[in-house]
Amino acid sequence: MKKTIWLVYLVLVLLPMGAGAEAAPSSEQFDPELAQTALQIAEMCYLPSMQASVLSVSGYRQVGLYNMDREPDDSRHVAAYALYDRVTEDERTEVIIAIRGTGEGEWKLNLDLMPSGNYDLPYAENFALAAEDILSTHQAYLDALVSPVFLVTGHSRGAAVANILGARLTDRFQAENVYVYTFATPRTVRGEYPAYANIFNVINPSDIVTYLPFPQWGFQRYGIDVELPVEDAALLPTAQAAYEQRTDQTGPFVSSLGKTEEMQKIILAMANLAPDVETGFQLRHALSHPGEATTDEPGMTADAFMLMLLSGGMTMNQAPSADVSSIMQTQNDFTPLLFVSLFSDADESTTWIASMHMPATYGAWMSALQ
């Protein structure tokens, strides 16, 4: 039997999709339309009732929602996700696993790269634990599937988990049966690893999250990176027009021209402060002067600084957070980073760093790519 996965018929969502079921190409061929569909499904993880309603139109049943409501002090390395399936006319089981991006209290988990304290691991342990939790939770379900085909998707935190989960499912069910589309994907693996031609990571090279953990630490991603053409001035009007038609905007459209170089400067400066994983988590930088902090003075690790920046400093308004403002008061190892084009121009209502990471920006530039 022909092995296909069917595009979901999405109605009343972020972008109009074609009616009916349209067969997707090979799992190893990037499909822009399926990518847009996957992004919408991933984004709707924040609205699970809408997600279930929309997918039910195409006959998908919600198998379950998992870890959606977490206490702020929940330190388990698990992901929030939804699982759907349907049986096709040719008796194949189509499974959708949509993994939510960062929720309340999860930024710390995002940056808790090696919770075991083993800094030599060849993978991002925090995200791998979340992927393995999904597999172990649904071991019996997976064992019972007959001729399954999977669509695995996620944005940001969800993308990292989806990247690893997609690789694990591919190892078990073969690449032709596993479609993986991730967006704003953190780095998940380093060293030698198999090539997964069915895993597509849609990347904005101006997005800070796609550089974490630092490439200088050797981290990459499973699969193939599909880099958005955000530095192409000729495509900028098309991307802006597509953005302005979306209902998931988080602020005005922000031009990405020149932002990739600025982001790479920020990442290089951060990596220079933390040349390896252990240094990033253990070395305390003084807050009142450049250099290492002594045992009796205030200090901050590079990891803690990134947590502060991403969970508090990367706000959707022009003003820096209180914690960021306090670090800006004195010269130290971190303050130069806060002035490397961190905040957008005065006439823009959102920080450019935040804007480059948002699903609406990704969707708009994917439209331009098409």
For the regions a language model picked out, list residue spans one by one.
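Bacterial N-terminal signal peptides
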Residues: V8-P16
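A conserved cap/lid and substrate-binding interface adjacent to the catalytic center
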Residues: S58-T153, T170-T182, Y193-F200, E292-T294, ...
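Positively charged n-region of N-terminal signal peptides that target proteins for export
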Residues: M1-T4
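C-terminal His-loop and adjacent cap/lid subdomain of alpha/beta-hydrolase
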Residues: S26-S27, S56-G59, L65-V78, R92-E94, ...
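Active-site signature of alpha/beta-hydrolase-fold catalytic machinery across serine-
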Residues: I164-R168
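The feature captures the conserved acid-bearing segment of alpha/beta-hydrolase catalytic domains
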Residues: V178-K259
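Gly/Ala-rich beta-loop-alpha elbow adjacent to hydrolase catalytic centers
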Residues: G154-G158, A162
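Sec-dependent signal peptide cleavage junction
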Residues: M17-P25
